[in-house]
Curated annotation (Swiss-Prot):
One Gene Ontology term from the biological process aspect of the record: monoatomic ion transport
Keyword Cell membrane tagged: yes
Membrane topology: Multi-pass membrane protein
Subunit composition and interactions: May form a heterooligomeric complex that consists of seven subunits: mnhA2, mnhB2, mnhC2, mnhD2, mnhE2, mnhF2 and mnhG2.
Claim: Transcription regulation is one of the keywords in the record: no
Full protein name: Putative antiporter subunit mnhC2
PANTHER family tied to this protein: ANTIPORTER SUBUNIT MNHC2-RELATED
Disulfide cross-links: none
Similarity-based family: Belongs to the CPA3 antiporters (TC 2.A.63) subunit C family.
Source lineage: Bacteria, Bacillati, Bacillota, Bacilli, Bacillales
Chief subcellular location: membrane
Organism: Staphylococcus haemolyticus (strain JCSC1435)
InterPro entries according to UniProt: CPA3_antiporter_subunitC, NUOK/Mnh_C1-like
Any one GO molecular function term: antiporter activity
Length: 116
C-alpha cells in the first residue's frame, strides 16, 4: 500500500511539474492544483500509526487507526486549494478576456533592444 501511494504521489508531482513548465496559463493553474493534491496525499500518508500503538481512550484493541489532526489539516488544505484554484482560474479568464492570449511568452511583451 505504501509503495502504491508513493508511486501515485511521484506521478502527481511529475505531472504537476510538467504542466507548470508549460506556456499555457490554464495548464499552469491545473499543475498547481495537482501539486496541492500531491501535498495532501503526503500529509495523509504520515497519519497512519503502527499496530503496537493503541487508541488513547480505548484499551485492549490492536486495530489500526489514523491521526484525526492530519485529516483536519488536509481538509483545510483542500478548501484553501480549491479557493486558490478558483481565484487563479478567474485571474486567467480575466487576463484572456483583456489580452486575448493565454500564452506566457506573448504576455511578457517584447524587450527593448536599446536598453541594457
Amino acid at each position: 500500500m505504501n509503495l502504491i501511494l508513493l508511486l501515485v504521489i511521484g506521478f502527481l508531482v511529475f505531472i504537476g511539474t510538467y504542466m507548470i513548465l508549460s506556456l499555457n496559463l490554464i495548464r499552469i493553474v491545473i499543475g498547481i492544483s495537482i501539486y496541492t493534491h500531491a501535498g495532501n496525499l503526503i500529509i495523509m500518508s504520515m497519519g497512519h500509526y503502527s499496530n503496537k500503538m493503541t487508541e488513547p481512550l480505548i484499551h485492549g484493541s490492536n486495530t489500526n487507526y489514523v491521526d484525526p489532526l492530519l485529516q483536519a489539516i488536509v481538509l483545510t488544505a483542500i478548501v484553501i486549494g480549491f479557493a486558490m484554484t478558483a481565484f487563479l482560474l478567474v485571474l486567467v479568464y480575466r487576463t484572456y478576456r483583456v489580452t486575448k492570449e493565454a500564452n506566457i511568452d506573448v504576455l511578457r511583451g517584447e524587450e527593448d533592444e536599446n536598453e541594457q
